[in-house]
């Protein structure tokens, strides 16, 4: 592939996820403000059991773990390099667990978490319908699912062409998959913003 533009906002779905590109992406976006903004925009309780799908180097996981200090936070990512980086800086957080995993095959038991987040990752899922089915499998009844995307390109979510290109598309697919109480709100911090979709398992 061609060279990657240095320090330039790109559509990450265009990347080939080899180790070199994963390291580059982790350096550029691993601690992006969207992680903090997402966690700050949802309610996290001390006893929550939370899963981050596509956790990257674990920035959001580590922020969330400080809030659910009596619970557990799982982070999964299909890229081994990302998980290695996440574990390197994990220190001694006993309520954090990182592992290689995909949205289509979540390595957790049925109804084992009460909240799931996906930050700038749902457009990477190879089979989003299967991924949404897995989300419902591991969520408890009435569990919450949050999908966060950066606000770019004049209020678009910048995912590029595809079935989940716009927030309207994502909301439609969540409805088809059987989620309820679907809402969409925008949040901003330091001139950066996110679209945050919230929905609930039946």
Where are these regions (language model features)?
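A short acidic, Gly/Pro-enriched loop at the edge of an enzyme's catalytic core
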Residues: 104-115
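Short glycine-centered segments of the SAM/dcSAM-binding site in methyltransferase folds
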Residues: 49, 143-144
